[in-house]
UniProtKB/Swiss-Prot annotation:
Protein name from the UniProt record: Glycerol kinase
Disulphide bridges: none
Top EC group: transferase
Annotated catalysed reactions: glycerol + ATP = sn-glycerol 3-phosphate + ADP + H(+)
Keywords: ATP-binding, Glycerol metabolism, Kinase, Nucleotide-binding, Transferase
Pathway it works in: Polyol metabolism; glycerol degradation via glycerol kinase pathway; sn-glycerol 3-phosphate from glycerol: step 1/1
Role summary: Key enzyme in the regulation of glycerol uptake and metabolism. Catalyzes the phosphorylation of glycerol to yield sn-glycerol 3-phosphate.
Length: 496
């Protein structure tokens, strides 16, 4: 039997999953990760806790699977993107907590970069917006605020990495300092056309090149896990940021194929092949997971509050005792009764980009109940995702392609049948849930398997992907369009 081990290091937890060569889950293990909030708008993780929890789950999952490390053909890594770690090359000790992707402390740097007129340069070279979301400004903050850090960086004594680089360094006992193109593309320092760090961007942010990891394709040999950690030297064969890994795990290998991950937020990616397409509709362009040195691209849109709206129903409104009960409450009414919830708790992301927006509930009447609000909250996830897909379809058509024909879904909230059916109704296309919804970890396993000969090609991997259920639209297109108009009207009311 052939086994692949995926390390899935996320924002809220570290997970490890063992897959067989057919892409089926054999065993999994998970440990929560402590969230650190030093002040409003700041979010940190302890890099040593990231490593401890990830190693512990890797050991645990091998035991659960009843296998030894020598039976594992390859290891893949997928990770929360943009989160920034800086450590000593000599001791391996972090010089500061990891600054998490949600952290906004670097916004003043972004204001300065925009004022200097760098937005067009950043967008042309990286596909990204100038935003504190991305790693480059977080790295600059560490260099500017940790005593002695900038001088140590100039001397080549420090290493920077996103979470994948940090894990690779630990797994190889500091012998490998590397990242893949998908993670590099989230730093605002990486030229997605040349697949290299960009000197002009490094100068703009005053970041020494000596800090940076080597860049490899997502499917490549990054080194071997030190035998003392898991019991054998396992090749590290795949590395990708979580959303690009999910795109790969969904077997979205051809231009125009789209996946949406329904997690705390929602992340929609459309593969655009070897074509770099700038969005005219509020999306960003990013590197897709690459199996060769040739660049591959994806368009991406991010919804800040997806499944988190269900947590708000539970913890804020106390409408439900547990998240799993939201579907039953929402199904207790035939529709939302004209109620619209726009969960702009932290502003609105793509395609609106309204940082000043705040959450609203509109359309309330004396007949409105908690069930109507719960249904409207659940439907808000589908409305936001529909706005993303419509933006992607417009971009695709403007670039000479076709409108999106099918949406592949994954993430925790995709198990909610009511939500998936409403999503299909709004979009007017099939929404397809795969048999294996652990697609983020599966993508890392597939990438590792490709690099080590378990799979011959992405065509072979495509044959392994299986649908569990297809949700077909059951709503008249005119009614779906009317609902989207109501949604857009509600969105306009979120900014005072």
């Amino acid at each position: 039997m052939t086994y692949l081990l995926a390390l899935d290091q996320g924002t809220s937890s570290s997970r490890s999953i063992v897959f067989n060569a057919q892409g089926q889950v054999v065993a999994q293990a998970q440990q929560e990760l402590t969230q650190i909030y030093p002040q409003p708008g700041w979010v940190e993780h302890d890099p040593l806790e990231i490593w401890r929890t990830q190693l512990a789950t890797a050991r645990e999952v091998l035991a659960k699977a009843g296998i030894e490390a020598r039976e594992v053909r390859a290891l893949g890594i997928t990770n929360q993107r943009e989160t920034t770690v800086v450590w000593s090359r000599k001791t391996g000790a972090p010089i500061h907590n990891a600054i998490v992707w949600q952290d906004r402390r670097a916004e003043p740097t972004c204001v300065e970069l925009r004022a200097r007129g760098l937005t067009p340069t950043v967008q042309a070279k990286t596909g990204l917006l100038v935003d504190a979301y991305f790693s480059g400004t977080k790295l600059k903050w560490i260099l500017d605020h940790v005593p002695g850090a900038r001088q140590q960086a100039e001397n080549g004594e420090l290493a920077f990495g996103t979470v994948d680089s940090w894990l690779i360094w630990q797994l190889t006992h500091g012998t490998v300092h590397a990242t893949d193109v998908s993670n590099a593309s989230r730093t605002m320092l990486f030229n997605v056309h040349s697949n290299q760090w960009d000197d002009e961007l490094l100068r703009a942010l005053d970041i020494p090149a000596k800090l940076l990891p080597a860049i490899k394709p997502s499917s490549a040999l990054f080194g071997e896990v030190s035998p003392d950690l898991l019991g054998a030297a396992i090749p590290i064969g795949g590395v990708a940021g979580d959303q690009q890994s999910a795109l790969f795990g969904q077997a979205c290998f051809k231009p125009g194929m789209v996946k949406n991950t329904y997690g705390t937020g929602c992340f929609m990616l459309m593969h655009t092949g070897h074509s770099f397409q700038s969005s005219a509709n509020g999306l960003i362009t990013t590197s897709a997971a690459q199996t060769t040195a040739q660049p591959e691209f994806a368009m991406e849109g991010s919804v800040f509050v997806g499944g988190a709206v269900v947590q708000w129903l539970r913890d804020g409104l106390r409408a439900i005792p547990s998240s799993s009960e939201v579907q039953a409450l929402a199904e207790s009414v035939p529709d939302a009764g004209g109620v619209m919830v726009v969960p702009a708790f932290t502003g609105l992301g793509a395609p609106y980009w309204k940082p000043d927006a705040r959450g609203t509930i509109t359309g309330l009447s004396r007949g409105s109940t908690l069930a109507h609000i719960a249904r409207a909250a659940l439907e808000s996830i589908a409305f936001q995702s529909a706005a993303l897909l419509q933006a992607m379809s417009r971009d695709a058509v403007q670039a000479g392609g076709s409108a999106v024909a099918e949406l592949r879904v994954d993430g925790g909230a995709c198990v909610n049948d009511l939500l998936m059916q409403f999503q299909a109704d709004l979009l007017g296309i099939a929404v397809v849930r795969p048999a294996v919804i652990e697609t983020t970890a599966l993508g890392a396993a597939y990438l590792a398997g490709l690099a080590t000969g378990v799979y011959r090609s992405t065509d072979e991997i495509s044959t392994l992907w299986q649908a569990e259920r297809r949700f077909l639209p059951a709503l008249a297109p005119a009614r779906a369009a009317e609902l989207m108009e109501h949604w857009e009207h509600a969105v306009r009311q979120t900014v005072l």
